[in-house]
Amino acid sequence: MLCLAGAIIPAVWASATEVVLKDGRVLRGKLGEVAGLAEIPQPNSPDGEGPSPSILLMDDDLSRTFVSKRLIKEVRQEETGHGEEKFSLHQSVKRNGLTIRSVGPAMRVQPFDEFGRRIYTMYTGKGPVDVIQGITDLTPRWAKVEGITHVWDMRIATSSIPREELQKILLKQINTKDVESYKKIARFYLQGERYAEARQALDDLMKAFPERKDLQEQLAPSIRAIKQLSAQQLLAELRLRRDAGQHGLVWDVLKKFPSDEIGGEILQGAGDMLKDYETKAARRVKVLEKMDALLPKITDNYQREELQKIRDEMAAELSINNMDRMAAFLQNADDAQMPAQAKLALAVSGWLLGSDSAIDQLPVALSIYGIRRQLREYLIEPVKIKREAILDGLKSQEGSSPGLIADLLSHMKPQADPPEVVSPERPGYYKLEVPGLPKEPPITYWVQLPPEYDPYKLYPAIVTMNGAGNTAESQIDWWAGDWVNPRRASEKNEDASNPPVPDEKKPDEKKSDEKKSAEKAPAVPMTRNGHAARYGYIVIAPQWSVEHQKKYNYSAREHAAVLNSLRDACRRFSIDTDRVYLSGYSMGGDAVWDIGLAHPDLWAGVIPISALADRYCNFYWENAKYVPFYVVLGEFDGSKLTKDALDLDRYLKYGYNATTIEYQGRGHDNFHEEILRIFDWMGRFRRNFFPREFTCSTMRDWDCFFWWVELDGLPPKSQVDPEHWPPPAGSRAAQVKGKITGNNINVFAGSAQVSIWLSPQMVDFKQRVSIVVNGQQIYAKEPFLQGDPRTILEDVRTRADRQHPFWTRLDNSTGRARGK
C-alpha cells in the first residue's frame, strides 16, 4: 500500500533543525552559525575561544538563509520519520578541469530533456559560453544540477521545472514494470504538495497494470487521502483569495466545492464561508430595500434629492469590502420608534465615515456628504487660487473640523480617477505618466491591479525596479504573472472548481508560448495567474532607467522616478501606505537598496535581488534598523556576497530584521522560485509611520524627510552629490534624531532648517505639547496645538497618504550652516 505517513510530514534532513523566528517564520534545514556572511561556517571552538557568532545560518540544500540570532524565538530538533523521496540520476559529471566560479546573466536556457539534461548558455566577458548540465539528485523541493562539460554544482527549486518536463524525467527513472516505482512517484508529488499530479500517478499505476484487480482496492485509502489533501489545499487557497478581496471568484468556487469523500471539517469550513457570503449579500439587498422604503417619507425636496444621489452611489459601490459601514443602520432599520430621518442619517453617515462614527441627525449627515465632495474637488484641483476658494467654502461649512476631514479622507475612494486601461483585453493594467524633476521629461510607470479590484479596499503594493536590459513591464510580469486566456486555463484545469495556482516557471521562459496563445486567442478579457494576483497586491513599475543604462547612478532623477510614481499611484488607486514594499533586480536591486535606506519611512520592506550595496548604502546602514530587508543573491554572482557582507554583517550583528538568501551554485538570476517565501515575508510586516524614536543618516539634500521630521540645508561636510563621489576626506553623514515621550518631542538635526509635522496619532492635541529642537524649546505654550484644514489637505494632496495625514506643521531655524 502507498504509505502517506511520510508524505504529509515536514521534510527532514540529517541533523535537521527547525528554527522559529519572532516574526512567525519557520526555517528548516541544517543549522550553523557564522560571525560574517563571507566566512566559511566553522564548528564552535571546544574551549569557547574566538568571537561568538552572531549570525544564524540555515542550509536546506537549495539555499542558505542568514538571519540575526536576535530574531530567534525557538530552536527545536525535528522528529525523525520518513525522509524525502529522492531520485538519483546517472550523469557523466565533470569532477575536475574547467570550473564555473562566476555565473553571469543567462542568455538562453534550454528545457530539460527526459534524461534531465539541458544546455545553459551564459554571457561572459569572452562571449557566450554553453554549459551542458544534468540533474543528479531530484527531490520534491530541490534538484541538484551538475555540469557535464564544466565543474558546476547548481541547485534549483523543483517547482521551477515545468510539469511536463518533470513528469518525463520521473517516468524515465522508474521501472515501468514495477508497481512500487509508480508509488514512489506518487509519494514524490505528495511531499511536494502537488496533489493533482499524485492522483495522476496512481491513475497511471492502475492503467499500467490492468491485470492487477487488487490495485484499485489497495489504493483506495490513498486516493481518498489525496482527495482530502486537495480539498484542504483548495479551501486554503479560497481563504487566501477571500482575504485578497476576490469574493466573486471565491463565491463561485464555493458553490461547486467538491464533496465526494471529503471530511466533515473541511466541508464545514467551506459551508461556513458560503453562508457568510450569502448573509452579506442578503444584507446588501436589505440596505437598499430599506433605503428605498424610507426615502418617500422625506418631505424636504432638497434632502430627498441628495439622499437619492447617495442611495444610487451605494447601489453601485456597496460591497462585501465596505458592508461593515452599514452595521449601525441595519441594527436600527427595523426600529418602529426611530424616525425615517434618523435611520437615513445612520445610513449616510455610516457610508461616509464608518459605522462607529454614524450619527442620527440627517442635516448634519447631508452636510458631511457635501464636505466630502469639496474635499475631492480640492485634491484634484491643479490651480492654487481655485483650491483656496474651495478651502474657504469648506471652512464655512458647519462641522468641517480637522477630525472630520481626516476621518472622511480615510474612508474616501482615491481622489483621482485612473485613466483607461492599456487594452480592454488586459483588465487592471495601466500605463501612466507623472512629472519628473524640473527640466526632466515626465516619468512613465505601469500598474497592474489585482482581480476584482475595489477602490474601497486597501491593497498592499509592490514598487519594483527593473535591471539593465529589462523593462518595467517585465517586472510586472515577474510579480503578477503572464497574461493567459481564462477559457484556455480552465480547459487545462481538470477540476473546474479549483482556482488556478501558478507554477514557478519564470515569466521570461513563457514568453514564446504566451505570444502564440495571444495570436490564436479571441479578443476576450485575459487574466494573470501570478502570485501578486493571488495575494491581492498592486504592482507598480516605474520606467526609471534611460535607454542603454547599465548601472544605477544614485541620482535625484532616479529617486524621483520611484517616489513620484508611488505618490501618483496612491492618488489614483487604493493603496495601503503601511504595506508598500520596494523591490528590484540587478541594477534595480542596487537602486532599491539605496532608496530603501534613504527613505525608510516609506516602506514596509525592501527586497534587493542580485544587488550590490554601495556608495550611500555604506553611510546609511543604520537606517536599516527601521525597515526590514530581504536580500536574495547567488553564490556565484561574482563577489557580490563578499561586498554586501560589509553592510549585511552590521545589520545582523545589531539584530536588524534583515534576511539574506544565498542560492547555491547560482549566479546573476532573478530567483523566481523564491517568490512564495517573499510573499510570506511581506505578509508579516507593516510600516510604523509614527515611531517613538529614530536616528537616521543623510548625505543628499533630497534625502530630507524622515517620518515626521523634514530637513533643509545640510552642513557642507555632510552633503555629497553623486556626481562628486567618492566623498572628500572628512565627509560624514548628517544625523537626524527624533524622540516622542508622552507629549514631549525632542529633535536633533544637523541642518539649517527643521520642520516638524504633527498628528494626533503622535501626541495628544488636547494636552500641552513640548517640542525641543537641538536642545532649544520651540513650542510649549497655550493654546494647545490645533489642526489646520489647509495643512491636512495639502499634505494629502502632495504625499497622497490618506491614512496618516499631518494636521499641523512647525518650522524652526537652527542657525547651522547650509551646504552648497
PLM region descriptions:
Residues 1-11:
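Bacterial N-terminal signal peptides
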Residues 13-317, 787-819:
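Compositionally biased alpha-helical segments
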Residues 274-459, 788, 792-795, 801:
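A domain-start/cap signature at the N-terminus of enzymes
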Residues 458-461, 465-571:
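Active-site machinery of serine-nucleophile hydrolases
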Residues 571, 578-625:
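Primarily recognizes the serine-hydrolase "nucleophile elbow" in alpha/beta-hydrolase
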Residues 624, 630-633:
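Short beta-strand/loop motif that positions the catalytic acidic residue
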Residues 638, 642-746, 750-751, 789:
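C-terminal catalytic histidine-bearing segment of alpha/beta-hydrolase fold enzymes
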Residues 702-820:
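C-terminal beta-sandwich/jelly-roll accessory domains of carbohydrate-active enzymes
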